[in-house]
Curated annotation (Swiss-Prot):
Protein name as it appears in the record: Very-long-chain 3-oxoacyl-CoA reductase
Catalytic residues (UniProt): Y202
Pathway the protein contributes to: Lipid metabolism; fatty acid biosynthesis; Steroid biosynthesis; estrogen biosynthesis
GO-annotated cellular components: endoplasmic reticulum membrane
Subcellular location as annotated: Endoplasmic reticulum membrane
PANTHER family the record matches: RH59310P, VERY-LONG-CHAIN 3-OXOACYL-COA REDUCTASE
Transmembrane region(s): 4-24, 182-202, 271-291
Keyword entries, A-Z: Endoplasmic reticulum, Lipid biosynthesis, Lipid metabolism, Membrane, NADP, Oxidoreductase, Steroid biosynthesis, Transmembrane, Transmembrane helix
EC class of the enzyme, as a word: oxidoreductase
Gene from which the chain derives: HSD17B12
Pfam families: adh_short (PF00106)
One GO biological process term: estrogen biosynthetic process
Length: 312
C-alpha cells in the first residue's frame, strides 16, 4: 500500500503537467490567432519599407489584388506580366483609383533571357516589397507521362514557378539588404504543403517555393528582411478556373486583404482563416488517407474535363 502512494503521486504530477502544457499550447494558439487574424500588421506594410512594390503576374487574380492593396497603402507599383495591353489597362486603373505612380515591364516568364530587361526597368528604384506571384498550373489533372506536350510543360513550369522566384529575388534583395528593410512575398500554394498526385510538377514546384522562402527568411531576417511563403488553397481566379467565390474559395481581393495582415507576423501562412483550418485538418490526416482523397478527387476532375473536351 505504501509503495503505491509514491506511484500515485508521480502519476498525478505527470497528469497535471500534461494538462498545464496543453493549456499553455491552446492559450498560445488562441493568442497567436487573435494577433494575426484579429489585429494583424496593417501599419507595417507600406511605403515605410520602401517607395516601390514590384508584383509579377500583376494583371490578374491574386497578383492584381496585391498590387491594388499595396497601392491603396500609398506604395508606387511596378507591374510585370506578359501582355502590354493588360499591363497598360491595370496600370491606368491603379493610377486613377489610388493616385500613385505606376510602371510596367512586359516580359514572358516562360523564357530565360528576360531578366536583363527587368533589371534595367527596376534600376534606381527603392523597392520595399516584392511579390513573386506569377505562376502556371496544369490545364487539367493528368498522369505525368500523359501530360500533353510534356517537354514544353516541364520547361515552362520550372521557368515560371521556380526560376522567376530565384531571379527576381536575386535582382531585388541586394537593395533591401543595403537599406536593412524590405519584404518578399512568395506565392506558393496549398498544393506545395502536401503532395498532389496528377498535379505532380505543379505541386513539386510550389514545394520548392515554400522551402526556398523558409530558408531565405532564416538567412536574411537578421538583416531586416522579411520573407513569407503564402500557401493559399482555392481562390476564385482564372488560374484555378473558379468563377463563383464561396466561403472556402474567396475572391482574390478577399484573400489578399486577409493575407496582407500576416506580413511581418507569419513567415509561412495560408493567408486566409478558412484555409488555415483546411491546412490543419489535412496535416492531421494520415498521409495514405490524404493521398487517396487527393488522387480520387483529381481523377474525377480529369474524367470530367476529358468528357467535356470530347463533347466539344
Amino acid at each position: 500500500m505504501e509503495s503505491a502512494l509514491p506511484a500515485a503521486g508521480f502519476l498525478y504530477w505527470v497528469g497535471a503537467g500534461t494538462v498545464a502544457y496543453l493549456a499553455l499550447r491552446i492559450s498560445y494558439s488562441l493568442f497567436t490567432a487573435l494577433r494575426v487574424w484579429g489585429v494583424g500588421n496593417e501599419a507595417g506594410v507600406g511605403p515605410g519599407l520602401g517607395e516601390w512594390a514590384v508584383v509579377t503576374g500583376g494583371t490578374d487574380g491574386i497578383g492584381k489584388s496585391y498590387a491594388e492593396e499595396l497601392a491603396k497603402r500609398g506604395m508606387k507599383v511596378v507591374l510585370i506580366s506578359r501582355s502590354q495591353d493588360k499591363l497598360d489597362q491595370v496600370s491606368s486603373e491603379i493610377k486613377e483609383k489610388f493616385k500613385v505612380e505606376t510602371r510596367t515591364i512586359a516580359v514572358d516568364f516562360t523564357l530565360e533571357d528576360i531578366y536583363d530587361k527587368i533589371k534595367t526597368g527596376l534600376a534606381g528604384l527603392e523597392i520595399g516589397i516584392l511579390v513573386n506571384n506569377v505562376g502556371m498550373s496544369y490545364e487539367y489533372p493528368e498522369y505525368f507521362l500523359d501530360v500533353p506536350d510534356l517537354d514544353n510543360v516541364i520547361k515552362k513550369m520550372i521557368n515560371i514557378n521556380i526560376l522567376s522566384v530565384c531571379k527576381m529575388t536575386q535582382l531585388v534583395l541586394p537593395g533591401m539588404v543595403e537599406r536593412s528593410k524590405g519584404a518578399i512575398l512568395n506565392i506558393s500554394s496549398g498544393s506545395g504543403m502536401f503532395p498532389v498526385p496528377l498535379l505532380t510538377i505543379y505541386s513539386a514546384t510550389k514545394t520548392f517555393v515554400d522551402f526556398f522562402s523558409q530558408c531565405l527568411h532564416e538567412e536574411y531576417r537578421s538583416k531586416g528582411i522579411f520573407v513569407q511563403s503564402v500557401l493559399p488553397y482555392f481562390v476564385a481566379t482564372k488560374l484555378a478556373k473558379i468563377r463563383k467565390p464561396t466561403l472556402d474559395k474567396p475572391t482574390p481581393e478577399t484573400f489578399v486583404k486577409s493575407a496582407i495582415k500576416t506580413v511581418g507576423l507569419q513567415s509561412r501562412t495560408n493567408g486566409y482563416l478558412i484555409h488555415v483550418l483546411m491546412g490543419w485538418i489535412i496535416s492531421n490526416l494520415p498521409s495514405w488517407i490524404y493521398l487517396k482523397i487527393a488522387m480520387n478527387m483529381n481523377k474525377a476532375t480529369r474524367v470530367h474535363y476529358l468528357k467535356k473536351i470530347k463533347k466539344n
